[in-house]
Amino acid sequence: MAAAPPPPAKNQGKAKQHVTGARFRQRKISVKQPLTIYKQRDLPTLDSNELEPSQVHHLNSNASSSSTQQPRDLHAVETGVDKNEEEEVHLQQVINAAQKALLGSKKEEKSSDMYIPTPDASRIWPEAHKYYKDQKFKQPETYIKFSATVEDTVGVEYNMDEVDEKFYRETLCKYYPKKKNKSDENNRKCTELEFETICDKLEKTIEARQPFLSMDPSNILSYEELSSYIVDQFKSAVKTSNPYIVTNGGNLEYISTTALKERLSKEIKYEPFVTIFDKNQMSTSAVRPIPKLFELFGRPVYDHWKERKIERKGKTIQPTLKFEDPNSNEKENDNDPYICFRRREFRQARKTRRADTIGAERIRSMQKSLHRARDLIMSVSEREILKLDNFQAEHELFKARCATKACKRELNIKGDEYLFFPHKKKKIVRTEDEEREKKREKKKQDQELALKQQQALQQQQQQPPQPPQQAPSKQDGTSTSQPYVKLPPAKVPDMDLVTVSLVLKEKNETIKRAVLEKLRKRKEHDKGFINLTDDPYQPFFDISTNRAEELSHIPYSSIAATHYHQFNTSNYMNDQLKKLLEEKKPLPGVKTFLGSNGELVPSKAFPHLSSLLEEKYKATSGYIERLLQSVETQDFSSYTNGFKDVEPKETNEPVMAFPQRIRRRVGRAGRVFLDHQQEYPQPNFQQDTDRVGGIPDVYCKEDAIKRLQSKWKFDTEYKTTEPFSLDPSKLNGISPSTQSIRFGSMLLNRTRK
């Protein structure tokens, strides 16, 4: 497969441009932009006529060794490698052989033998044991591996070299440790890992305490200062639960593996502490603590390390990678071949404060989750250690019982057989579980008590008020019961204080639920019917809309209009009903009764309309009469377009339709003005209307004209009528005085309740 080749050149100018520029990419390949992939069968077969002149000349030229100038290879498909690597000998031979085979050249018959030499990995290397001593594979206990990017968490950074190995064998292993007591831990010789641990501690400590040691290597800290600082740091790291330690400079450093194991071992009270990160858990020798190592091998290792440190002029003993020096010249960094990990200039992504906040929250939540997981793991470890101790104690008890049983048999002692069998363990009830159970029962009782109080309160509200005749009162002024009864504190009911706002809120919610329930039942009752009545839900109130300018809102109004012929009938007549009207078929499931005597009208086409017409329900030519007339005349255009208005419009002054379209404007001192849309021209206020011989106006005429113009902005030629929706009392024709009396009585009844 290969990337998409550039388009072929159509003329000579484009061919030259293709030779010079199209072969090399103008910009870097971006992973965000898709690249077309071609397979070998998708590539065109190029003949010598289709190739460019430079390519044909290159393929036909004899590759002689005496030629001083080697032509550049121009291929139909890019090689995909860098420009400098394209000059590699084996790559050029393979590409040229492939192109000659493509053109059908028979001169080179061994073109198939050309290949790029690569190491053969299909064979067994017999000399591998000389370089790799670890030949045996050991199955790990778990497949979980630690993917750390910092070497501090998996081992020691310091590695022994030839000088260290010579000192370790000739000096450290022969003369140390000095035998002071017979303890196995003190008599054990120093291992290579322990030697590397001591050197690593010395390297990191001197780097933190004396960062500018290379200026004067002889002024190095003494052994007493370094050892005391390292031991104190180790003890403080073991005591705390923080995996980081704070240096003198304020930097955070991760604790070493030895200190981490020591701390975890003391926390769970189990030794030795072996992790899955070790190579072989069964044979790994435990590294002794740092204080013990410095006590046994600190002085000789320090002398050896100090000598090497001074020899290196204060720099690190271990070879390190060389990075770019920001203070040096850029050309020096580019020409230095030992600099690794060179910087690449990338455009930094812009970060917002919101992104930083989200990232911090995620890191904080992840830290909490890790702390929670660590606590769970430590709890499980402690539980398993206790189980192990319990099993060991039971095993020791079992062996003691067996020995005692054998002794009883030898001495022929009988009785006390129950002592040799394990008893049934009693269930241990923890105090925490008991307290948790008590809290749960108390919470349940409190919920039941609150529910009972709420039910009693609702029953009191639903009970009707008692009539005044039943009130216990006497004319002589005596009463059967005392108005105030003093109860002891133990018998006073513990009830919450009920406020007036809470009672009114519950009452309003009860009324709202009752109204919604009635509306739901009415909706279920009217399901499957087409409502053509004047006003099924609101009280009847005839509103004349003949003079309305905009009729699109009438079918969706809260009060239905009585003049149906003024708006489109398709809003409430579906296609099925239109089809029945056109075919003169009776409506299915519809029965019509006469309004005068209740007689059933025979089933025929539109009996309900005919009965209404015979009864002369309306004297004027209304909607039903027009509908019957259109059925008789076979004119069904009114179903879609509506009936024309036959009532002449009054020529009175126009009345503004409600709602009005106005604009809200805030003036000086926070005053609010409502501006109407100026649809009519303003009169000319500047016309001189002063009469001859009249009294001259001493006030400024310009101010008066401005006031008239401002007043005209808020005026309109329509007569604004007060909408009935702003005063609900007008729906039933109630006068304002009667409405005020009704409102006062309503407030009085509410206060009594």
UniProtKB/Swiss-Prot annotation:
Q: Which family does it belong to?
A: Belongs to the enhancer of polycomb family.
What coarse category fits the chief subcellular location reported for this protein? nucleus
Q: Which GO molecular function entries does the Swiss-Prot or TrEMBL record give?
A: histone acetyltransferase activity
Q: What does the UniProt entry say about where the protein is found?
A: Nucleus
* Entry superkingdom: Eukaryota
Give the record's GO CC terms: NuA4 histone acetyltransferase complex; nucleosome; nucleus; piccolo histone acetyltransferase complex
Query: Which stretches are tagged as biased composition: Low complexity?
Result: 450-463
Any one Gene Ontology BP term: DNA repair
Kindly state which keywords UniProt assigns to this record, in alphabetical order. Cell cycle, DNA damage, DNA repair, Nucleus, Transcription, Transcription regulation
Identification of the protein by name: Enhancer of polycomb-like protein 1
Cell cycle recorded as keyword: yes
Q: Which InterPro entries match?
A: Enhancer_polycomb, Enhancer_polycomb-like_N
Q: Where is the composition biased (Polar residues)?
A: 46-71
Its source organism is Candida albicans (strain SC5314 / ATCC MYA-2876) (Yeast)
